[in-house]
């Protein structure tokens, strides 16, 4: 035909067999990518420290998605929780990867078969003998099957009736594990952070899909509606499919970026809003107050803070700190976290406890300012020493650590105090290994950031694709200059197939 590159997909118009073939091949590529990517990630993933070097710090992208629906063990003998595993069973990380690759191969063979044997009687209209697809019926079949799958996932997999459940954690991402979840049928089911809503929504949406599928299988569309929405034209299917995909992409970009029960912070890392709102800082403060109420010393109180919780309260784990075009995992930026130095507490010579003002998300540099509990500035690291009134040297600031590796250690040397004050701007202070990965010290985003950016971007592109193909199918006659009264049935009941000399033409 000599088609330009942007029109090559017209070869599958009026060719149901090869339309099916290219969709099989597309699914083979998607499944093959998923399996191959999983094997690659498993080859580079280090499961040895789930607290300070979790999957999201290592830039894992598909492992978190497997984990959130119940895969936690590896044939390599490790578990995501850090336990040793003797028998991981068939549905290990590697088992899931292998199954996707096997499926990809089978789909590849099916695609070749349908490309070769494209002219099946199944695809021919009995009345006219021409290639034809009953698109409303196909829509009903797909709706019914996806409804069954959706219902089955909610009613069996998530609830644990026949399946492992899903990843469930506490609000601070400390106690996460895979467990069965009961559906939440009340108003709480609409809370995006309630796991029970995932089960109930899958069950409800599945039932709706099954009923809608049966409806579309048993009821034919009215002729006026069929013609108005161009239901006989396969480009209508393309347009509405793109609409469904871009809508879903926008939704998941939101649930990923703002956080939800479907995107646990143990698997995808914290959200930027948890840093902006001091979410983990407030929980740590609450725990310290509770310990002090039990007459524990500051050292004992801070020693009870889980290292995992302290690590969340560090700006380097904020997905908005990494630039969108800085490639690589978080570990390639600030390094592999080795240990928590402890909580730095600053005091001036008058005995006021001072708090370092934390860096906001979108700042690369920020003045080092120390305030008392009433927010009054008591000390700083001045830009111009000649005019300074609150410098660390003048105010006599000291720092003492509680909990962590430097528990009980204090420093009064101004240079050391300023060093830790600068680091306290970034939240809790950790020691990092930057040598192993040759980390460059520049923050990277977590998979949460990459997923959001990718899905929001593609959703926007697909939105325009929906408008484009929707306009093409609704106004095809206008664009093509074809007489609207043309009665020859071509291209699934619409108009002439571009470049195909065999379709009937209107006599000039």
Swiss-Prot record:
Principal location: plastid
Record keywords: Chlorophyll, Chloroplast, Chromophore, Membrane, Photosynthesis, Photosystem II, Plastid, Thylakoid, Transmembrane, Transmembrane helix
Stated family: Belongs to the PsbB/PsbC family. PsbB subfamily.
GO cellular component: chloroplast thylakoid membrane; photosystem II
Matching HAMAP family: PSII_PsbB_CP47
Transmembrane segments: 21-36, 101-115, 140-156, 203-218, 237-252, 457-472
GO BP terms in the entry: photosynthetic electron transport in photosystem II
Protein name: Photosystem II CP47 reaction center protein
Function according to Swiss-Prot or TrEMBL: One of the components of the core complex of photosystem II (PSII). It binds chlorophyll and helps catalyze the primary light-induced photochemical processes of PSII. PSII is a light-driven water:plastoquinone oxidoreductase, using light energy to abstract electrons from H(2)O, generating O(2) and a proton gradient subsequently used for ATP formation.
